[in-house]
Amino acid sequence: MTTISAPSEPYRAVRWWLISVAALIALMVLVGGATRLTESGLSIVEWKLVTGSLPPLSAAQWTEAFEAYKKIPQYRELNAGMSLSEFKEIFWWEWSHRLLGRFIGVAYLLPFLFFLWRGGLSRELKRRLWLLFALGGLQGAVGWWMVASGLSERVEVSQYRLATHLVLALLIFAGIVWTVRRLKERAQIAAPARLRFTSALLLVVTFVQIYLGALVAGLRAGRAYNTWPEIDGALIPSAERLWFETPWWRNMFDNVLTVQFEHRMTAYALFVLAALHAFDAVRSRAGLAASGALWLFAAVSLQAVLGILTLLNQVPIGLALAHQAVAIAVLTLAVMQTERLASRQSAETQPRVVPVSQPG
């Protein structure tokens, strides 16, 4: 049987496919952010995987959708008297968010099946791609679980479920970014072990900050305490105000003041850690890791400025979405920096021998 050696970049097509999916996920997160900021997330009160792909196409269908929305607490307590045209405005945001989610599922699954049929994927890569697909399916379920939390007793979705939904989306995104980088041969960067540790720590703190940011969003905490650097009249609020709920740990997730304070403090920690990592990388002459650290520090700095401006201006949609977009950029750079400094031994990059006479 005649065979040919795999090309120098055996996974070039796979990489571009995954890059496209990652870009779609980033767009999905931003559309989700706009859906939340416009209070549109509860405008569709049911989940229909297939038939839900089509919006209302007649006046009767629009009336039916609007009447269903009128039955939930959000309409009765916040939007009573809303017109049909106003309902359509919030409906389109949520419908677009769900449609994009379906499109991402198709954009991932169909090429994945093709690459499986074509062959040439390593066992490790196939396991990773199946895991990402499973997480994508879980994300769809988590999205409906989140929406369901606001349909019976609340006028908004649970901040816990919102944070879970966002973090899972960006965990999938980060997994794809890591996988894309692992699919291309790169020389191992000679750098001190402490740089590998601080890059990984930066990635962990970035995820923690994203989670806290989602809690802030879910509690509408960005519309309170709109001063900086003071919060509630002081640099550090009083313990009585921070910890008045019982049990004490609930304040970390439910107390608007405490959650915003946590988000601020974590932002400061992330800024300092990024600065120290960049200084150490440059001083250590770590090559590409030094430039990567500087880019990461620049993104964290920009994110801090945007966060302050968003707070001081009481969360205008444009600034809030810019803040969310730069958060995705910070996460991307943190993943790239961690992968750059990690061990380069990877099963995904092993060349394969592909038979000419058959697909795989």
Curated annotation (Swiss-Prot):
PANTHER family noted in UniProt: CYTOCHROME C OXIDASE ASSEMBLY PROTEIN COX15 (PTHR23289), CYTOCHROME C OXIDASE ASSEMBLY PROTEIN COX15 HOMOLOG (PTHR23289:SF2)
Listed transmembrane segments: 13-33, 99-119, 129-149, 160-180, 199-219, 265-282, 292-312, 315-335
Reactions catalysed: Fe(II)-heme o + 2 A + H2O = Fe(II)-heme a + 2 AH2
Pathway: Porphyrin-containing compound metabolism; heme A biosynthesis; heme A from heme O: step 1/1
UniProt source species: Bradyrhizobium diazoefficiens (strain JCM 10833 / BCRC 13528 / IAM 13628 / NBRC 14792 / USDA 110)
Cofactor(s) listed: heme b
Any one cellular-component term (Gene Ontology): plasma membrane
GO biological process terms, semicolon-separated: heme A biosynthetic process
Keyword check for Protein transport: no
GO molecular function: metal ion binding; oxidoreductase activity, acting on NAD(P)H, heme protein as acceptor
Record's keyword annotation contains DNA-binding: no
Protein's cellular compartments: Cell membrane
Similarity remark: Belongs to the COX15/CtaA family. Type 2 subfamily.
Assembly notes: Interacts with CtaB.
Keywords linked to the UniProt accession: Cell membrane, Heme biosynthesis, Iron, Membrane, Metal-binding, Oxidoreductase, Transmembrane, Transmembrane helix
InterPro entries for the chain: COX15/CtaA_fam, HemeA_Synthase_type2
Its biological purpose: Catalyzes the conversion of heme O to heme A by two successive hydroxylations of the methyl group at C8. The first hydroxylation forms heme I, the second hydroxylation results in an unstable dihydroxymethyl group, which spontaneously dehydrates, resulting in the formyl group of heme A.
The protein's Enzyme Commission number: 1.17.99.9
Top EC group: oxidoreductase
Main location: membrane
Topology class, membrane: Multi-pass membrane protein
Amino-acid positions noted as binding heme in the UniProt annotation, renumbered to this chain: H263, H323
Protein name: Heme A synthase
One Pfam short name: COX15-CtaA
